[in-house]
């Protein structure tokens, strides 16, 4: 499948990202959310990514259709976590199983290294075996499970954490 990696923008990609988010909210446990998001949510989401200097990486088809995207953001708000980020990857339902999630995640890892981060963390629903397998193939280690922290579709949901340690930054500093 021919595709290209792109830096997503609000103007070009917000509607497609919103569709992918809302499908995940309404049909899966990939997002522990109940209500579909709005365009206003996307304005705030893109603004937060821009203010934090966080990438929003997409995969487009030759025709310009957004097939997958991913991003990362702060793992926790306190300053000592400045070298740690939490990422997410979403693939449009029509394009799953084609390796696009891997392409996005590899791009996020490269961006984290370029930005001198030290660890990238994924919080994954424990039943999402495809995402877990992808993370394990790329060297992420299972570092913990939080049992029954979510409730959706009439079921308690377990959340697993996968972490990849990077060799960057070379000279970390306090403060």
What do the PLM-derived regions correspond to, one by one?
Residues 18, 22-45:
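Conserved GNAT-fold acetyl-CoA-binding loop/helix
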Residues 74, 79, 121-124, 136, ...:
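Conserved catalytic-core motifs of GNAT/GCN5-like acyltransferases
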Residues 168-175:
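Acidic/histidine-enriched, glycine/proline-rich intrinsically disordered or flexible terminal extensions
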Residues 3-17:
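A short beta-loop-alpha structural element at the N-terminal edge
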Residues 91, 97-110, 129, 133-137:
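Conserved acetyl-CoA-binding loop-helix of GNAT-fold acetyltransferases
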Residues 112-124:
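Conserved GNAT acetyl-CoA-binding A-motif
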Residues 35-94, 105-106, 165-166:
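Acetyl-CoA-dependent GNAT
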């Amino acid at each position: 499948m021919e595709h290209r990696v792109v830096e997503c923008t609000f103007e070009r990609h917000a509607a497609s990202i919103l569709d992918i988010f809302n499908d995940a909210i309404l049909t899966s446990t990939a997002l522990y959310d109940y209500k579909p998001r709005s365009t206003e949510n996307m304005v705030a989401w893109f603004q937060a990514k821009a203010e934090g200097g966080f990438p929003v990486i997409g995969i487009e088809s030759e025709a310009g259709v957004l097939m997958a995207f991913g991003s990362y953001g702060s793992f926790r708000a306190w300053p000592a976590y400045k070298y740690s980020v939490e990422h997410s990857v979403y693939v449009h339902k029509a394009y799953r199983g084609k390796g696009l999630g891997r392409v996005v995640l590899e791009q996020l890892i490269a961006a984290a290294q370029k930005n001198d981060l030290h660890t990238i963390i994924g919080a994954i629903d424990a039943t999402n075996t495809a995402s877990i397998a992808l993370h394990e193939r790329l060297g992420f280690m299972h570092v913990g499970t939080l049992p029954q922290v979510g409730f959706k579709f009439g079921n308690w949901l377990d959340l697993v954490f996968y972490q990849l340690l990077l060799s960057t930054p070379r000279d970390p500093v306090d403060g």
